[in-house]
Amino acid sequence: MALSQNIILRLMNRFPMLQYFTDRPFGIEIEFYGLDYVLAPIDNNIIKPYCISSRAKDGRNFQQLYKDFKIPIGADRDCWHFEKDGSVRGKGHTQFGAELISPILRGITGLVQAYNAFRFLCNIQGLNIDDSCGFHVHHGVDSKVFTCKQLQELVRLVYPIEEYFYLLIPGNRKNAETCKPMEIDVMAFLDVCDSESEKGSDKITQLWYSLENHYDPKSARYPRYDKTRYHGLNLHSYWYRSTIEFRYHSAVLNNIDEAMEWIIFTQFLIELSQGHVPNICFYPEANKWLNTIYMIYEKLGHENCIKRLAN
């Protein structure tokens, strides 16, 4: 408990935007290669903890390692678990491509779990990342509240600064097949929600699941793997699991602060899209994502909501 409190204090001091972090549910997926494991066809791509032979860098066995970091690794999708990831190349092969997937997390205590998960991965011998690896963040939304208008507002926020995301994020993510820029008809997307009518919601769904956006009708049989999900802003996840997924970011292992900043920043975008515009403080030495928030506020005409701290 003391360790968690120390991490919370560190995060609060390190990330000023954490004061606006809400209890909205979120989840993360961290891709990498180099995990030694075996997988049976009946495992449904879930890597059972007892099927992992990797050890800690200091020689501890795998089970002891995740217990020490208080990351309860399990064998189903309702807990922290590992899955095989065929999109991860890992020095030209996919044999050991994998990802660590979180359960549903909430608030600062969830952020502490995510922080510890990265520390846990950093201590596994042989784990590494390359350009084929990504770091994905899901933020939960209630479809009764987060409707056509909020989806529209989110696209309105993200689309003008999408290029900026790709510039700020390490690696050449813009050209990656798994996190492409928006390919929907954005102007049409922003023009269909004049009311909360069912007609507007149907139209926005049609615009997402279009051939232009790489929709494949055959994939409807396997909705989890719908091809429209391979965009930096994945709205397929909205209809599939009631989350908004941000896939822009490259994989993160050692630079844990970068991962924390991205989680906080992307949640803030969701809150903005729901009309939550808090007063925020101006910090001259703000990190790149807080600076991006300042830029968004200025573009939206919310300059008066940026408060300068007294000297």
Task: Mark where each language-model region is.
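His-enriched metal-coordination microenvironments in redox/metal-binding proteins
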Residues: G134
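Short glycine-rich beta-strand segments
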Residues: G140-D142
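C-terminal accessory/tail domains of diverse enzymes
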Residues: A2-N128, K144, C148-N311
